[in-house]
């Protein structure tokens, strides 16, 4: 994560925890702290950091430590991997039972993230890829394999386009709900 991106994460925490001692003086005085966080969290990308900070703000009364932030970010990454693997296993099971990729995809409900990922890959036919293997005697054999890497990349892109895991954009106030201040 860059310093600018970490500053955005800290801006969210500043809003969530305005009375915390660490934020006295605002973002301008947090330079060394932000440098430390960036140095300690090189493996966390901005999107994962955003998801982690949203979850932490919902769950914690106090600003998180670097270790708590990293732990939550790792949980976000694990959730993404689990979601991708679950979708892939569903597709692979159907294809393993003799269904073509087109038949496996046809069973999926319209508008799902899995379908959008497959469309982003270039269609159901891209779920199976072709490779070549050269043997020691110079013979070349063609083989087919499940294109997990292509699916994983496309599905992760789709997940990252949504505002939070397992949800789309949320309305702040639904019909009949009261806002803060009592207005409907």
Residue ranges of predicted features:
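Charged interaction scaffolds used for protein-protein
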Residues: 1-184
């Amino acid at each position: 994560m860059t310093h600018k991106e970490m500053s955005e994460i800290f801006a969210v925490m500043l809003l969530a925890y305005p009375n915390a001692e660490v934020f006295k003086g605002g973002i301008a005085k947090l330079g060394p702290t932000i440098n430390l966080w960036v140095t300690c969290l090189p493996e966390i990308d901005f999107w994962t950091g955003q998801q982690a900070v949203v979850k932490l703000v919902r769950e914690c009364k106090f600003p998180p430590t670097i270790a708590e932030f990293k732990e939550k970010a790792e949980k976000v990454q694990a959730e993404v991997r689990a979601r991708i693997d679950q979708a892939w296993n569903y597709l692979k099971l159907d294809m393993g039972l003799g269904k073509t990729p087109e038949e496996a995809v046809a069973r999926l409900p319209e508008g799902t993230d899995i379908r959008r990922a497959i469309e982003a890959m270039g269609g159901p036919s891209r779920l199976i890829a072709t490779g070549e293997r050269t043997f020691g005697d110079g013979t070349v054999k063609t083989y087919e394999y499940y294109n997990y890497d292509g699916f994983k990349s496309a599905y992760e892109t789709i997940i990252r386009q949504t505002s939070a895991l397992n949800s789309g954009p949320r309305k702040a106030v639904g019909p009949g709900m009261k806002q803060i201040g009592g207005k409907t």
